[in-house]
């Protein structure tokens, strides 16, 4: 057991206005309410549990938790200070799993059941394994994906969060040379709507690995996302096995000459309008609030896309690595220089009814 380093801070809020990039009758986008935490800290992982409880993780071996909607934060350190916690998956305000990334034994999974007061090491990867992203279902099943080694996938599964097992045979096809994921936001694996989904890159073809909740193996779908070294799928969002979104691109901003956001439905990929952000897209989420919205971010900012009106709204110019939501309104952003913020939505409009005199 490793004792945490905990301290609490009370933090002010600031509002940031948005920029509209198309004229339409789209509903009003959310505003960004910024909270400044440790100024030198880079936050990457986000796991909102409710409107009030949010966990974040980042470099320097640090995790933070707020239970009062971001007015104050408790900080903890699950392990050594040189670990980079690129992903965090919380169960509630007491229990959470934190994933650190890297090879040479740096890829680890820690668990707390007392709000970060203490952390236990639950899994340590071998020296040649580089884990990227983690997701946990409401039923407690977990999948962690890493970069392939030779002709083997490197994945870790837990049926309940207690025992973690390395698996190399969970995918219906072998990996391509150097195929793996990107640990930019913990968004390259996701569970949603009884569907497990993984996005890959750094290979000849960027692919989706996808299966239903009770599926035995992941099916493989080739995508039109830009591919090759430093390129591919960075974030995924499944509606079902036959309906999902992918975001990504190339780490070299000047090489992003292809669509970075795609929708797959009924066997067909459709490129969505390009967001007002430079460079590859690091994160992706979807909410339903006065219509359906896609949310994405990267080091050039964050943006919201209203699907019905096909309208982009630039939310921020900050260096934002991740944006994640819980439900239809509890959305949080995290990035460099201590950046933590939440989206504040205008109250949802009640559906109009026709009154017959």
Q: Language-model features: where?
A:
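Bacterial N-terminal signal peptides that target proteins for export
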Residues: 2-10
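Bacterial N-terminal signal peptides
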Residues: 9-19
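Residue-level hotspots at or immediately adjacent to binding/recognition sites across diverse folds
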Residues: 23-357
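Serine/threonine-rich, low-complexity intrinsically disordered segments
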Residues: 4, 19-21
